[in-house]
Amino acid sequence: FGASDPAVRQRSLEIMEKAIQLADDLGIRVIQLAGYDVYYEEGSEQTRKDFAENLKKAVEMAAVHGVVLGFETMETEFMNTVAKSMKYVDLIDNPYLGVYPDVGNLTNAAKTYGTSVLDDLETGRGHLVAMHLKETVPGKFREIPFLTGHVDFPAVIRKGWQLGVRRFVTEMWD
């Protein structure tokens, strides 16, 4: 949503509109959004501003169809914690935008910042739409076989359940 090229930003909204319509047609209630302002370029204040503007438009489109958008917490500084995701959830202030935390990415962020994954999850209280269960090791975010890394799955699942999460999706690598 935040690309510096206006044509790319416009195309992102067109794709989002089609995704929301498809979700509605299929009865899908939640779309997971990758928490990036930009992916193929360097982020800036302008990309973050454009991201927020287009995010607002996307959430308004989703609300019309009763589809919830949930940010996946990613591996980049832009949105690698629930707390960072919540800045945008609070900014947009619409019940059709929430957080879909990736506990592997959260675990790596917590290791980097010296913080607690469970405390970070708490910052999303009332706004967690589902939980993405994925394994990681410090500094590596993909292709880690389940239960060979450092994610404390029992603790994060318990915390998610305590916070009202009832939908869990796993990402497993073989």
Please report, for each region that a protein language model flagged, where it lies by residue.
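Active-site acidic/histidine proton-transfer and metal-coordination neighborhood
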Residues: 1-99
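Histidine-acidic metal/acid-base catalytic patches
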Residues: 27-29, 79-174
